[in-house]
Amino acid sequence: MFSKLKKTWYADDFSYFIRNFGVFTLIFSTMTLIILQVMHSSLYTSVDDKLHGLSENPQAVIQLAINRATEEIKDLENARADASKVEIKPNVSSNTEVILFDKDFTQLLSGNRFLGLDKIKLEKKELGHIYQIQVFNSYGQEEIYRVILMETNISSVSTNIKYAAVLINTSQLEQASQKHEQLIVVVMASFWILSLLASLYLARVSVRPLLESMQKQQSFVENASHELRTPLAVLQNRLETLFRKPEATIMDVSESIASSLEEVRNMRFLTTSLLNLARRDDGIKPELAEVPTSFFNTTFTNYEMIASENNRVFRFENRIHRTIVTDQLLLKQLMTILFDNAVKYTEEDGEIDFLISATDRNLYLLVSDNGIGISTEDKKKIFDRFYRVDKARTRQKGGFGLGLSLAKQIVDALKGTVTVKDNKPKGTIFEVKIAIQTPSKKKK
């Protein structure tokens, strides 16, 4: 655990760890204090209620003391006669003791002397208040009592009894309370230690998406800068060549101009792709609309013309014979990316097949070619931004490794899946499944 703490101290998620651990510490500390406070406040509730009840009936308290007495004291007979008239029975237990005092707070009856109660001293200022005292018995053991002092107000007889003190032994309650407090502290401390590990885990989990996002952003900027560096270098080289030939005609430098224009087109395509990706990062929200079957026929006709211009054989099959509901713009962009990718990675006179079909809930796109193919290792990375299977070939074809990344985002937005397979004997197959709706279920 200490090694984890040491690593966290120097990690990027240390601030998250401190924040989480601080919250857990505050929670467990507050819970511990509240529980202990509740225990203390409720520990003597029943004892204090009993003492208050006895203080309201001093005659019954005197009767209790007399009944427990083992010897007679001065003026006790008159007090016995008067107290015997009490009909209300006091609510007492075996751990309750009564001490009688005269007006000078001299003990008249102290009960069991073994308990050491004959040595306690009370004062009039404590009258009517419940408080706690510690008494040592004959064996030197400490006993804890809750005490209330009351005035007897016995005036019908001649007696020296002026005050009575009721004591209830709470030593067992104190011992039980201490054990419970220790148990609570141990349990809370254990959970506090567990919260340390929980804070480590939460810090790692909380910061992971941020770190991944920062790494992707850093990689994105580095790759974009790298892609822009090449066309800028070409432009600089061509322009410097033009400056070195001030007497040359346009025909003489037409190759440099054409190359520069090509690089400008590449940069414009790159910046457009980057802008599209940035917009998609904010979240693609499909706008559903009815897409007629003629849309696919028109799109395939355009693809056929492009394939012919690039000396490719393009075959298509439209198995959709009804109107579907999806985002037409995103669907066309997805189809174009897959078609353009097949054209780039297929040699001249190569073959490209595009099949589209649908069920009640899903639309299926299948694009296959007999091009150079994609290795198993590359299949895991082709949807990453700026990843290219053959960088030299892709660069020559004007690609930047952004198309398939954007296609994956579109597929995810349309609640679909895309898989890549090998075509036999060579080439690649892209299979796409996206969710669609029927016109009757179109969302308004």
From Swiss-Prot:
Q: Which PANTHER family does the UniProt record give?
A: PHOSPHATE REGULON SENSOR PROTEIN PHOR
In this protein, which residues make up the domain named Histidine kinase?
223-438
The UniProt keywords, alphabetically, are: ATP-binding, Cell membrane, Competence, Kinase, Membrane, Nucleotide-binding, Phosphoprotein, Transferase, Transmembrane, Transmembrane helix, Two-component regulatory system
List the subcellular locations.
Cell membrane
Q: Name one GO molecular function term.
A: phosphorelay sensor kinase activity
Where are the Phosphohistidine residues found in this chain? 226
Gene, per the UniProt record:
ciaH
Q: Spell out the Pfam families in the cross-references.
A: HATPase_c, HisKA
Chief place where the protein resides: membrane
Bilayer disposition of the protein: Multi-pass membrane protein
| Name of the protein described by the UniProt record | Sensor protein CiaH
InterPro entries the UniProt entry points to: 2-comp_sensor_kinase, HATPase_C_sf, His_kinase_dom, HisK_dim/P_dom, HisK_dim/P_sf, Sig_transdc_His_kin-like_C
Spell out where the chain crosses the membrane.
Answer: 21-41, 183-203
